[in-house]
Amino acid sequence: QLHVNKARRPYIL
């Protein structure tokens, strides 16, 4: 699942 954190940097959980 692809999510975007508050810093607008993509990361995968």
Swiss-Prot record:
Disulfide bonds: none annotated. Smooth muscle-contracting peptide. Belongs to the neurotensin family. This is Neurotensin. The modification Pyrrolidone carboxylic acid is found at Q1. Keywords: Pyrrolidone carboxylic acid, Secreted, Vasoactive. GO terms for biological process: blood vessel diameter maintenance. It is found in: Secreted. One of its GO terms (cellular component) is extracellular region. It comes from Gallus gallus.
